[in-house]
Structures are given as structure tokens and as C-alpha cells.
């Protein structure tokens, strides 16, 4: 498999390298059908290359199939929409759940009914990609949020680790104890964005949409969640990532300045590489005022280009990428939770390692409490903008909760009326 960035720079050299690699890898193959894949940039090209080399490559090679991975750097969704519109999209591509309705509405995604067996996959994940009775994507994996914590900081503070019995109140007390260790130590890292905060709004009993598709940001439950979230930042028990030179809560955790981050299984590989000596644990999100935890489901599916000239081979690659063997490998690498229902009781979850325990928590978190998919209907990710702007304003001290949410509600109403 070859990863090719979308850039004109170095194109001749890159093509020569690609050709040499493919000839070397498939020298014994009389013919090879090349399947182009579009996915995320960042770490994903290396992950897919390893998956091919270590798990599914021999099988595909025997069938005369080669792969070219084309990472869409930057704004993946915008780049994919452009490629679909221009007719240059790959044979196979990621469909993030948060933008699935818009991607499918282009008419460029092949319905998979009768082409791929969806029965082995978790029902809720199949439903997330089902529109008008047609299945347009097979979830490659999924994630929910967990409380991932630095054991050493809690030990130093002489306070119990976060656990599944924590309420917002007991959880906050533990964060305060850790933050009391030093001026540059904080109990938690709070992302000023819906992709993490949303779990707390759900724990308060808030729902993103009512029966009419309206979003109420002045709902007392939502207001309560914002006030709780902001209060911990304002008193110094929590910190924003940017305030300690980080871009996300996983980066905060790796600094040894923060006791807790709210992340999915994607953080495990990062910690293994960036903080190999970190002694960490994981537990469930704290119970909110509703008496339930809150959480969100994050998933990405593989979709097939309806205009692909290599439809059968693309479907075969999709099946290989979502096979039990491939998903077992993804699980053991600490990257995500498998979407196949049969892997829910995988022995890996019970091996007792920190990675295994974190994966178990993330898996079980998907069905524990008030859980909503990280999806926003046809509005797409723009739905988060009013909420994110309000959180930034409140958590940075630029606006009161009331003023920020009133403004956010006006923006949300305008957005939903388009």
C-alpha cells in the first residue's frame, strides 16, 4: 500500500516511488487491480499501511488487488465533497457520521444492500448509515468518551482515583485536590468545544434536538452543564488546552500537568508514543444531575464510490478492512473499538492491561446512560459552531453564561432555519 498526499509538489518522484513499491510488492502477480482509498491525513496513512502489511495484505495480493491511500489533509469533508463533485473521488473513502447525510445526498455513494452482509455489525452503527432503507457505509470502528487519568498525580494528591461511582460533585472535589498540588498543575483539561463538552450536557438531561428538529441552548439542563464546566475552569481546577500550549486534552494529559482528560481509545496510541512512562487508568464518565452519565458515539464508515470502475474490487477491500482479523488488530493497537458485534466480548478486554481496561470502558460507555451519536443531521458540523463560540467566550471569561448562550441560541435558530 502506498500513501500519497494531495499536492503537486514532488509528483514525479512520488509516482516513481509508488510504481517501484507496487512492482516490488506484487512482483509475483500477473495483474493487479488498483483501488484508491481516500481517508484522513495525520496518523491514518501509517495505520492503514500497517494494517495491510501485518493483517490483510497477503490475502489481497493473492487476489491481485493493490491499494493506494490518498490522505485528504486539512478539512477532510470539504476535500471529499470537492472530489465527489469533480468526479475525482477514490473508489473507497471514509464517511464520518457527522457529515454522512450530506455526503450521501450527493448521490455518489453506492448503496450496499445485497452487496455486503451487514448482520455481523452493531445495529446502532448500521442504522447511523441507513437512509430511506439503504445502507451506505460500514462502520470501521467506533469510540465513546472515557475519563483517562494520571495515576501519579492522584497518588501525590492523596485522593482516590476517579471511578464509576463519581457524581459531578465527587468528581469535581477530586479535580480540586489535584489542582492544589501546584500552580501549574490542574485537575482536568476541558476542551471549549461540543466534541467533549456535549457529554456533560447529555449527563444533565439535555437532548440535542427535539421532535421538531429544534435545538434549545437555553434549556436549564444545558445551562447547568455550561455553568458547571465553566466554574471548574474559573476556579483553576481545570484548564483549557491552549493555556498550557496544547491543542487537545490528550496532549494535556501527556504533559504531566493535568490529572484527567476526556478521550476515546484513540488517545492510547498517542500516550504510548508521547508519554510512554505515564501511569494511567480509565473509568466511566461521571454521573450528572439527570442521574445518568452522558456520552457520545464517534464513528467513521467505509463507503464505495457509486461511479467506481472497480466496484467489485472496492467492495472486496471494504470487506477485508472490516474483517474480524482487521478489527482485532485495530483493537489491540488501542486505536478504536470494533464495529462487529461478535467482538464485543473479545478476551482482549479482560487482559488487565491499562490499554485493555480503557478499551473496555470505552466500549461499555457506548450504551451507558444518555448517549447520542456525534451527528447533526443535514446541518452537519456547522451545528456545533454556535455552541463552540459560546464555550470559548464563557471559558475565557469574555462573556457570561447567560449572554453567551442567548447569542448562541440566535445563531442556532438562524442556522436551522436555512
PLM segments and residue spans:
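Conserved N-terminal structural module of periplasmic/extracytoplasmic solute-binding proteins
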Residues: 4-10, 16, 31-102, 161, ...
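Extracytoplasmic/periplasmic substrate-recognition and gating elements
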Residues: 33, 62-66, 157, 231-238, ...
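Long, aromatic- and glycine/proline-rich binding clefts that accommodate carbohydrate-like moieties
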Residues: 33, 332-385, 393
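Short helix-initiation/N-cap motifs at beta->coil->alpha
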Residues: 70-79, 98, 166-172, 240-254, ...
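A structural signal for short loop-to-beta-strand junctions that line the ligand-binding cleft
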Residues: 83, 90-91, 118-153, 185-187, ...
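Hinge/lid segment of periplasmic solute-binding proteins
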Residues: 96-146, 172, 277, 281-283, ...
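Periplasmic solute-binding protein
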Residues: 101-108, 125-161, 190-211, 296-304, ...
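Glycine-centered hinge/linker elements that transmit conformational signals in sensory
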Residues: 175-176, 214-242
Amino acid at each position: 500500500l502506498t500513501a500519497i498526499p494531495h499536492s503537486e509538489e514532488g509528483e514525479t518522484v512520488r509516482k516513481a516511488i509508488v510504481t517501484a513499491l507496487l512492482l516490488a510488492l506484487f512482483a509475483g502477480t500477473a495483474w493487479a487491480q488498483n483501488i484508491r482509498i481516500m481517508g484522513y491525513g495525520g496518523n491514518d496513512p501509517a495505520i492503514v499501511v500497517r494494517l495491510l502489511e501485518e493483517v490483510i495484505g497477503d490475502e489481497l495480493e493473492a487476489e491481485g488487488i493493490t491499494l493506494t491511500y490518498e490522505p485528504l489533509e486539512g478539512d477532510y469533508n470539504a476535500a471529499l465533497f470537492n472530489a465527489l463533485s469533480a468526479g475525482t473521488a477514490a473508489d473507497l473513502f471514509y464517511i464520518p457520521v457527522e457529515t454522512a447525510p450530506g455526503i450521501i445526498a450527493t448521490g455518489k455513494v453506492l448503496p450496499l444492500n445485497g452487496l455486503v452482509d451487514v448482520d455481523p455489525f452493531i445495529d446502532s452503527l448500521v442504522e447511523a448509515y441507513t437512509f430511506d432503507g439503504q445502507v451506505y457505509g460500514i462502520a470501521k470502528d467506533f469510540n465513546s468518551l472515557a475519563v483517562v487519568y494520571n495515576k501519579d498525580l492522584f497518588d501525590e494528591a492523596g485522593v482516590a482515583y476517579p471511578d464509576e461511582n463519581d457524581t459531578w460533585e465527587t468528581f469535581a472535589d477530586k479535580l480540586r485536590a489535584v489542582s492544589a498540588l501546584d500552580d501549574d498543575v490542574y485537575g482536568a483539561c476541558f476542551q471549549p468545544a461540543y466534541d467533549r463538552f456535549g457529554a456533560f450536557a447529555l449527563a444533565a438531561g439535555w437532548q440535542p434536538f427535539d421532535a421538531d428538529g429544534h435545538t434549545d441552548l437555553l434549556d436549564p439542563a444545558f445551562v447547568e452543564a455550561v455553568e458547571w464546566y465553566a466554574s471548574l475552569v474559573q476556579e483553576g481546577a481545570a484548564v483549557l488546552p491552549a493555556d498550557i500550549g496544547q491543542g487537545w486534552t490528550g496532549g494535556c494529559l501527556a504533559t504531566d500537568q493535568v490529572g484527567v482528560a476526556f478521550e476515546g481509545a484513540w488517545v492510547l496510541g498517542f500516550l504510548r508514543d508521547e508519554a510512554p512512562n505515564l501511569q494511567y487508568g480509565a473509568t466511566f464518565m461521571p454521573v450528572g444531575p439527570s442521574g445518568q452519565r452522558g456520552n457520545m458515539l464517534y464513528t467513521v464508515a467505509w463507503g464505495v464510490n457509486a461511479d467506481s470502475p472497480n466496484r467489485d474490487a472496492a467492495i472486496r477491500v471494504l470487506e477485508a478492512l472490516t474483517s474480524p482479523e482487521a478489527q482485532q488488530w485495530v483493537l489491540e493497537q488501542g486505536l478504536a473499538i470494533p464495529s462487529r458485534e461478535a467482538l464485543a466480548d473479545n478476551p482482549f478486554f479482560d487482559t488487565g492491561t491499562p490499554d485493555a481496561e480503557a478499551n473496555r470502558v470505552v466500549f461499555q460507555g457506548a450504551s451507558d446512560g444518555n448517549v447520542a451519536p456525534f451527528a447533526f443531521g443535514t446541518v452537519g458540523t456547522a451545528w456545533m459552531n454556535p455552541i463552540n463560540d459560546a464555550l470559548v467566550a464563557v471559558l475565557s471569561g469574555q462573556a457570561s453564561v447567560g449572554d453567551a448562550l442567548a447569542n448562541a441560541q440566535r445563531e442556532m435558530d438562524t442556522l436551522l432555519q436555512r
